[in-house]
Amino acid sequence: MNKDNTPFDRSALASYFLEFLVIGHRGAAGLAPENTLPSFRKALDMGCQGVELDVHAVNDASGEQQLVVIHDDTVDRTTNGRGPVSLHTIEQIAELDAGDGNRIPRLAEVTALAAGYIADTQPLINIELKGKGTAAPTARFLRTHPGLAVLVSSFNHEELAAFRETDKTTPVAPLFERARGNMLETATQLGASCINMSTRMAKPSLIEQCREAGMPVLVYTVNQLHETQRLKAMGVAGVFTDRPDNLIPVIAR
């Protein structure tokens, strides 16, 4: 954590862009069950400067909202359970097997893991707002966990705007899978610190346009070294990867 617990803001994030970033996608999703503590630990142990995760909000037995780390709207694909995430309580979520005997972690467990790493720079945590209504509980969580190095992103730009209304400081990034409106205008309206986009969108002309506007670009999901090197030469700020083992040994040289 930041030694003085100062808020992590746009200027703090900018220091991460001084080097090319390799961010573990759902941890190291190609090497361990996605969005589990062993997956995040593996990504950080391999040298990723950060990890990306997805959050949904569920209720506990008292009706309080809790943030859990899972990608899909249902638990079907990644666990031994069935049904929408939102219809499970935190207690029911804790009973599910998310692969190799691992549980679906709470957000607090992942941030504690990342904050506990001894490194020159604490790992960046990219929290993607996945479920509807995740903006408010995520903002509350960050208020009670100061000093974390966090970037908040979402494909749901309305949810991201709701987060920005509540939290004016934490860096945000709109996510784009395909061209949709004016990306730079959207980013500016959100007060974004960077743009996260798919590999198919990452064309030289668009990357240059973003760079000229002072908007760093992070690209997902990149698992091959040659593609990473191509994007790095193009000027992107970093990539999200399921396979840090393919990238870190060369990129980190």
Question: How does the language model describe each region?
Answer:
Residues M1-R253:
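Phosphate-group recognition and catalysis centered on beta-loop-alpha active-site segments
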